[in-house]
């Protein structure tokens, strides 16, 4: 949909600004416009024209300030990787592999490694999203398998979400850091293992929300 296209376009621009366009005089807003048009053309759904017009303007505001914000927030850094691919074996699960892509990995002057995941959103994240352990577990697992891949000490790696806010008037770009210590890592790995075993054993958990009108059940509130 439009939201996915918007997020993909911004991700691409942020990646390109730190790789092929680094230290070049480029128009970030124009880069976004080009990428967003590409993504829109791929959509095989009816588009809301008013939303598309708004997204063009919103993206053109976000694109020029994202990388400068990261540079201000983290200080001088070098890019370790963009779109870092993880394809690592999950211990004790019979050869199953963890697959993921980290948006951005940087190394700061204090020799810390920072794993960053871009999240496009409307006005930002509320308290519930910021405290949601399931959201945080994404980065926790990224860190665990990244450290395993490169044999890096976990204490040398920090994790962050970079919020790119479409409709916010202020703080349009924000870095939100998450904890990823030993206890949280252990909990995330255990939850992942449980999920894999559940799927492997073909155990299907009933979705009780499917019994509501929101899911279009034809028998909702019938005898």
For each feature predicted by the language model, list its residue ranges.
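RecB-family 4Fe-4S metal-dependent nuclease core
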Residues: 1-223
């Amino acid at each position: 949909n439009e939201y996915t296209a918007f997020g993909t376009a911004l991700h691409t621009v942020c990646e390109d600004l730190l790789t092929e366009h680094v230290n070049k005089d480029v128009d970030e807003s124009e880069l976004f416009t080009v990428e967003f048009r590409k993504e829109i053309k791929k959509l095989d759904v009816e588009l809301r024209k008013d939303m598309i017009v708004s997204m063009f303007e919103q993206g053109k505001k976000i694109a020029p300030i994202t990388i400068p914000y990261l540079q201000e927030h983290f200080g001088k850094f070098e890019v370790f990787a963009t779109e870092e691919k993880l394809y690592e074996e999950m211990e004790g699960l019979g050869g199953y592999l963890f697959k993921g892509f980290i948006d951005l990995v940087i190394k700061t002057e204090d020799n810390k490694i920072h794993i960053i995941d871009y999240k496009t959103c409307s006005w930002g994240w509320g308290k519930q999203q910021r405290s949601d352990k399931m959201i945080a577990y994404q980065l926790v697992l990224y860190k665990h398998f990244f450290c395993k891949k490169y044999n890096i000490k976990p204490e040398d790696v920090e994790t962050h979400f970079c919020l790119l806010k479409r409709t916010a008037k202020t703080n349009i770009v924000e870095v939100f850091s998450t904890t990823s210590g030993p206890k949280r890592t252990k909990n995330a790995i255990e939850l992942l293992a449980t999920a894999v075993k559940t799927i492997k054993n073909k155990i299907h958990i009933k979705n009780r929300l499917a019994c509501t009108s929101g899911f279009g059940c034809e028998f909702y509130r019938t005898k």
